[in-house]
Swiss-Prot record:
Name the UniProt record assigns to this protein: Ribosomal RNA small subunit methyltransferase G
Molecular-function GO terms, alphabetical: rRNA (guanine-N7-)-methyltransferase activity
InterPro entries in the cross-refs: rRNA_ssu_MeTfrase_G, SAM-dependent_MTases_sf
Main location: cytoplasm
EC number assigned by the record: 2.1.1.-
Keyword Glycoprotein tagged: no
Pfam family for this entry, one: GidB
GO cellular component: cytosol
Alphabetic keyword roster: Cytoplasm, Methyltransferase, rRNA processing, S-adenosyl-L-methionine, Transferase
Binding-site residues for S-adenosyl-L-methionine, renumbered to this chain: G75, L80, A126, Q127, R141
Sequence similarity: Belongs to the methyltransferase superfamily. RNA methyltransferase RsmG family.
Classification lineage: Bacteria, Bacillati, Actinomycetota, Actinomycetes, Micrococcales
Function: Specifically methylates the N7 position of guanine in position 518 of 16S rRNA.
Record keyword Nucleotide-binding present: no
Gene name for this UniProt entry: rsmG
């Protein structure tokens, strides 16, 4: 397969994965590639692999999102995965939770640029929303060890709500280590899923913690 053919396959696969959010995700990627490094959102080495590693990869949790309702993306940073999910699912109310002012300023500009009417910004730590916000799902990508993340996020979930955490190679080990923390909550199931978005054997691990 030539380089051009490979690119076509990659684009078509991305379009299939992102669905109606594809065009907005392309624009998001352009903005992040142009401004992300100077604004301290991504490192210089991330720019060449931004599209697949960060933008498309954000869709790994999409299949477990609720059919309706609201989602909170905790520690969203540059908007990953929250902005991508908001683009893919305009029917959901997406709450982007980020304590750093400069990142929230970026997210506010992004919301306007991408016409994300379904996005609400919260410049707080997740713990500050306990008792104030209830959602059907929480997403998190490279935020904290699972035990700590569970204590921050599970109080935000409504009944039968789900935490979807994108993790690395230690996903199962983190889940095992978090057993003590999870006992304090009404957890129904907790499992690790290997997600191969592009069908190329490269997997992303998603930890799913669902409440009763």
């Amino acid at each position: 397969m030539t380089g051009a053919e490979s690119l076509v396959v990659e684009v078509e696969a991305s379009r299939r994965i992102l669905g109606d959010g594809f065009a907005g995700a392309v624009r998001f990627g352009e903005l992040l590639a142009e401004h992300g490094e100077e604004r301290g959102l991504i490192g210089p080495r991330e720019v060449p692999r931004l599209w697949l590693r960060h933008i498309v990869n954000s869709a790994a949790v999409a299949r477990w999102l609720p059919d309706a309702g609201s989602v909170a993306d905790v520690g969203t940073g540059a908007g990953l995965p929250g902005v991508v999910l908001a683009l893919m699912r305009p029917d959901l109310d997406v709450h982007l939770v980020e304590p750093m002012e400069r990142r929230v300023a970026w997210l506010s500009e992004l919301r306007d640029e991408l016409d994300l009417d379904n996005v609400t910004l919260h410049q707080v730590q997740a713990q500050e929303l306990h008792g104030k916000l209830k959602v059907q799902a929480v997403t998190a990508r490279a935020v904290a060890p699972l035990g700590k993340l569970a204590r921050w996020t599970l109080p935000l979930l409504s009944r039968r709500g789900v935490l979807l955490a994108q993790k690395g190679a230690r996903a199962q080990a983190e889940l095992d280590e978090a057993a003590v923390d999870l006992r304090d909550f009404a957890v129904d199931t907790a499992s690790v899923h290997d997600v191969d978005l592009l069908g190329d054997g490269e997997t992303t691990r998603v930890v799913e913690v669902r409440l009763r």
